[in-house]
Amino acid sequence: MDYDIKFTWDKNQFLDQEIRIPKYTLPWDFKSSPFDKDFENQEMEYVKQFFQNYENAVNYVKKNEIGKIAALNFPLGEKDEYMVNSKLLDFLFILDDYIYESRNYEEDYVDNLMDRSSKSHDPFGREIWRLFDEYYRVGVKESVDLLIRDFEYWSRSAIKTNKYKSLNSSLSIEDYFNSRHGDFGMTITASSCTSTLYVENEIRESKNFKKFFKYFELCNLMINDCGSFKMEINEILLTNFVKVRAIQLGSIDLALKYCVGLLNKYIIKVDKYSTKLEQQYPNHSHLKKYIYTLKTFTAGHNKGYGHANRYN
């Protein structure tokens, strides 16, 4: 393709182009948690610790409606599990929006965050360890250990991606996925919604599991990038593959069609490798629930676009 490589997005290059996402259908059903009101009634009290004044906290809750997103993302857990997952989701959005995306922090911030004994924790450093302790109370130790590792990996990746503008318009979807894999957040989300399930390393290291999980992430990446494109159109970073593809093709419409085409392929791959995985380990009850949980999460993630203010 004959075009100059871009490291930032300029919406003025695409003025008057229509944003219309082609229709697609997921084969998995979404559900909603019966505990959604329990969290929504407590959300304001929870998030105010991260803001300098109460009005800012109120504005954040109204603008984002994370409670609605949580109800769709985590519909299968018991109340204790749902509450900690919902708090973590709020925590991640606020940490990313106000800390990591500010580009004012280096990795030493994460070093301090992950040091439980640090005497210089900010509200995020204090809260993340309270959340981890809560996960240990309701989840499986090995799965919570994995969640903590995934959180640290996500944090370091998010700081690097936001600060150093490593993404550019020359990337293929595979290159883009490899660049965004850490900061996108699907790994930590998968760890949080499956913290009560135990899937052994032997299974996680198998070819079929790695393929299944890769396509689960790719599927959600395309759902995210198509669903959030309109919201992110004013942001200059190329942390959205629709932007990357639009620069390559000179058209937002063609880029959206391309990304939905990828999504449809990834949906088929998720089902293909989940079937192979269940056939490979037919007597593993946690594995079947793990797969079902991630498919249900994906359906809820998709439903969240157009349902909560954050994505409108």
Swiss-Prot record:
Superkingdom of origin: Eukaryota
GO BP, sorted A to Z: sesquiterpene biosynthetic process
Motif (DDxx(x)D/E motif): 96-101
Pathway: Sesquiterpene biosynthesis
Induction field: Expression is almost undetectable in vegetatively growing cells. Small amounts of transcripts accumulate between 4-8 hrs of development, continue to accumulate until they peak at 16 hrs, and decline thereafter.
Catalyzed reactions: (2E,6E)-farnesyl diphosphate + H2O = discoidol + diphosphate
GO molecular function, one term: sesquiterpene synthase activity
Intervals of motif NDxxSxxxD/E motif: 224-232
Disruption phenotype: Impairs the production of discoidol and discodiene, and leads to delayed multicellular development.
EC assignment: 4.2.3.-
The protein's enzyme class: lyase
Coiled-coil features, chain-numbered ranges: none
SUPFAM superfamilies: Terpenoid synthases (SSF48576)
Keywords of the record: Lyase, Metal-binding
Note on domains (UniProt): Contains several highly conserved motifs that are important for catalytic activity including the aspartate-rich 'DDxx(x)D/E' motif and the 'NDxxSxxxD/E' motif, both of which are involved in complexing metal ions to coordinate the binding of the isoprenyl diphosphate substrate in the active site.
Role according to the record: Terpene synthase; part of the gene cluster that mediates the biosynthesis of the trisnorsesquiterpene discodiene which has a function during later stages of multicellular development, during the transition from fingers to Mexican hats. The terpene synthase tps8 converts its substrate farnesyl diphosphate (FDP) into the bicyclic sesquiterpene alcohol discoidol. The cytochrome P450 monooxygenase cyp521A1 then catalyzes the oxidative degradation of discoidol to form the trisnorsesquiterpene discodiene.
Similarity comment: Belongs to the terpene synthase family.
Name of the molecule in the record: Terpene synthase 8
Source organism of the structure: Dictyostelium discoideum (Social amoeba)
